[in-house]
Amino acid sequence: MLRSLTCSSTITSTSLFFRSFRQLPRSYLSPSSSTTVVGASGRNIRRLSTLEAAGRRLFLRRGLKLLSAASRGLNGQFSRLSIRAVATQSAPSSYPGQDEAEKLGFEKVSEEFISECKSKAVLFKHKKTGCEVMSVSNDDENKVFGIVFRTPPKDSTGIPHILEHSVLCGSRKYPMKEPFVELLKGSLHTFLNAFTYPDRTCYPVASTNKKDFYNLVDVYLDAVFFPKCVDDVHTFQQEGWHYELNDPSEDISYKGVVFNEMKGVYSQPDNILGRVTQQALCPENTYGVDSGGDPKDIPKLTFEKFKEFHRQYYHPSNARIWFYGDDDPVHRLRVLSEYLDMFDASPARDSSKVEPQKLFSRPRRIVEKYPAGEDGDLKKKHMVCLNWLLSDKPLDLQTQLALGFLDHLMLGTPASPLRKILLESGLGEALVNSGMEDELLQPQFSIGLKGVSDDNVQKVEELVMNTLRKLADEGFDTDAVEASMNTIEFSLRENNTGSSPRGLSLMLQSIAKWIYDMDPFEPLKYEEPLKSLKARIAEKGSKSVFSPLIEEYILNNPHCVTIEMQPDPEKASLEEAEEKSILEKVKASMTEEDLTELARATEELRLKQETPDPPDALKCVPSLNLSDIPKEPIYVPTEVGDINGVKVLRNDLFTNNILYTEVVFDMGSVKHELLQLIPLFCQSLLEMGTQDLTFVQLNQLIGRKTGGISVYPLTSSVYGRDDPCSKIIVRGKSMVGRAEDLFNLMNCVLQEVRFTDQQRFKQFVSQSRARMENRLRGSGQGIAAARMDAMLNVAGWMSEQMGGLSYLEFLHTLEQKVDQDWEGISSSLEEIRRSFLSRNGCIVNMTADGKSLTNTEKYVGKFLDLLPENPSGELVTWDARLPLRNEAIVIPTQVNYVGKAGNIYSSGYKLDGSSYVISKHISNTWLWDRVRVSGGAYGGSCDFDSHSGVFSFLSYRDPNLLKTLDIYDGTGDFLRGLDVDEDTLTKAIIGTIGDVDSYQLPDAKGYTSLLRHLLNVTDEERQIRREEILSTSLKDFKEFAEAIDSVSDKGVAVAVASQEDIDAANRERSNFFEVKKAAL
């Protein structure tokens, strides 16, 4: 596994409007199986703490998840979805005229050329139903389709969310159990998922292959308009909820994919705060309930209400449809007309309108509890958050842009004043639930702090208000305003949406207004509002622009809700006891005949879930042929040379006049005892000052001159080698004309930053611990994966020390040590720098067009000449591992994260490309059916790290523990009993190639080239693996069973779970787990 640690050390841009998705839309796929967390390669990425695993299959893949240089979000405490314009060529000339559109049943409402994305956009209206269609045409090969319904719920039973899952479980034309999974298996999709927002449900797909794209479109259109689920109670029970009783003598339990997903959500304090915030700000409209579903309310949902919700809202009259890319605009309408013409007009568009929340006349205050562990001082684990609903109606683009700019000025970088003052106050550990939210009908702004002592809650509230008042009175530093403006303009020019298709980002941007019956074109046109904002700042000064916004929308706004979250170590157990009591009463109310019938129904559902679809049904799902697949891998044009004796990789790609660069240093001379300090060392490089610059000035300089700089460690096993690859990478980007500034600032960060600010370092430790604790609760599968890797290979051990449970334990100890031995810590940070900073073994990777690369070489040479010749330390041998054992990590949670792993190379397996096909097939069939569908977990997957030989299984938000491990152990028998036909095998191969050839932006291509070089992955070897993939046979599946058996027999199991479930497991299998309690 290749690992990269972000270390909270990125200084870079986010998006034009700097949206903070504090309550992210729920998606159909879990993070253990979802393309929403898939890197640019299409591979699943395991995140833990500061770790983002990136490139495990470099033999195969063009792309990897962008690491630190991909935006961290405004303050690192909440997630953001970058939405940027796309730089493409002008639109294709073939566009439906009015007559042609009329023949297909559409009228043209409006038409514009959007210069910001160099696209021709036409808004059509289907005359019969009123369905609106945005048809965006350009030369982007990554085609995107999306259909969005307005779906405002009236309660928290989770109807929109359960329906989002269920419509993808078979339809009129595709009557198998889950055509969605068939698409996962055998499509070249670059995006395939679905989202539930608080007031709408989105179904987007994307592909670069035209035939594949329209296959996806047809399956999705049939799924939303003609799903089987409205006539099949079993789908409702499977995806939503049902009573489960295996034997009348046993206890009844709740099961259901969404039910367990939301149990996981309601186990995370940050998520609870986000939901409380939304509901408290908007108690009178649809935002006052949880569209995802509250686990206490989900069992109140009936099948009849479920069916009625679909009938009411899933109608063309209530739909907005988006097309984007280089496909034929006429064909788009032709495909749509076949579906839309089957419907008449409906009042759904009127009945689904979201009513605005009326503004409060005075502020309100709410106190809520959240589940906490028993360890530590609970009095210091409060959270406090101030929240404002900014307006009683949507804002115009000009005001929205100005508020987004203001948001970035206040919170966007470590040097931003509101963020800086709160974190330096000592009143809390990290920001939480903070930033501007403008994706819903009415915009919101929040600022919160976690790790607050109970006697400091009032002080935090006062500090927030006093700081906002001071900012309104005094304004912002000129350099800060310039840095923010450069950040915005760089972001718009770069158009970097990471692994998400650009057309999807534009769709989500457009739909945020369109869904409320506003102009869908307006959000795509930023040039004039930005030009106007810059002119206002230049003419009147930034204070006259931003101070009135602070006054009007925050300080003088009575619609403010202050939320205090208090830790409650008994909350989780009380909720479990309450659920158990409800189920006991349900059972007590049943007769013997009722219980027998429930046990029969439980078995009936299980049999249906575990019975495969007949081959004829599977053939209904359209798919590609192997003849559609290129026989050769995609190559990155990389030239290896040197500058002043240092190796330089040049990736000649069009980047829209942007230079991307990585400078790589070897960690081989860093002492073992300093390893765990490296993430904090990386953060310190970017968030401490120099002799001449404060850290604020340094941050502003980076913001003004570049598109961002990040520093992070990277570790990976290397195929065929015992010693791991361990590097420290400095990554940056700038306009080509600013290349000299970029390399000067990189040099400044590496050589001039001083480790003298004790209080700032203490903040880093507290912030890192808070992030780790949040990830342990919400991404336990990543923690489990890291522990298993640390037991099985050296690179895994190194990574876990810097980003897993061991790192969290280290942070707890370090917090005390900062006060006791700061001089020693400061000296250790300096020693780390001396140990790796050297020209010797350094590699520079650059990505831009050839001319720009040539023009940049002189700045690279100057940078390299300033580096020390040799590192100060001697080479260190890394050979540590965690002891092999089955381990259970206790956290306060209502769901579990269950893993098992083993090294199949150790058992004699020789790498073959077929292993990638087989691994994907296991995830999409055996584990999907048994762990998710039958078991009720939100996700289950497997992963093969071809660099180390570690094969691992993971589940996510799982109600089970030992049962899931038994499923993993049955994988070998599953493979031996497999009887796949040619179509199924072809789908598995094509789906794997889809991962291998997934779409990449230029910076990701250049970064992938670097990683392949570091891990000795040649193009010749990639060709061999590709040929092995394409020639995979049933015999390969059978033979791989033996390798999987070694995981069952000799592997290690790690579970992140509740104390109750771990105790039950150890009772059932005497002392199966060694128990380790996480300090939360």
From Swiss-Prot:
It comes from the Eukaryota. It is found in: Plastid, Chloroplast stroma; Mitochondrion matrix. Keywords: Chloroplast, Hydrolase, Magnesium, Metal-binding, Metalloprotease, Mitochondrion, Plastid, Protease, Transit peptide, Zinc. The active site is at 164 (proton acceptor), 239. The keyword Protease applies. Completely inhibited by the metal chelator orthophenanthroline. Gene3D superfamilies: Metalloenzyme, LuxS/M16 peptidase-like. Disulfide bonds: none annotated. GO terms for biological process: protein processing. Its EC number is 3.4.24.-. Belongs to the peptidase M16 family. PreP subfamily. This is Presequence protease 2, chloroplastic/mitochondrial. The lineage of its organism: Eukaryota, Viridiplantae, Streptophyta, Embryophyta, Tracheophyta.
